[in-house]
Amino acid sequence: DSDGLRTFYIANIKSIISYACPAWYNLLSDTDKTRLERIQRSATRIVLPFSDNYEQRLDHLALPPITTFLHTTCSENFTRIADNDNHPLNSRIKINTNRTSARRAKIDKYRPSKCRTTKRQNTFFEFYMRFFN
């Protein structure tokens, strides 16, 4: 029964794969992302063994690619933190208060730190402040 296996995959495997993804997702190398996608590809092959194409299996099971799911999860997490002034991590997000026009207000909503290294730029808050600007 593919519905039961799909539910098992989402509840057990996907939840383990995506655990604490805001802490590590943006620091993954392309090789690591490929490995995660390979895990999902194998799982969908178990759920739908007679389907040849990975994209068709994802469509049939209503699953996004794992990297898309993780990126969406991180984006939603950042938005939830940024929109809630009472969130304990909200103070880590720097809002740009020196906005001069409506156009610049949209472009420069967040003020990311000046980072010297790519690793620092790809941390959760720095990456998504740049992403949403």
Question: Positions of the model-derived regions?
Answer:
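Hydrophobic/basic alpha-helical segments
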Residues: 1-133
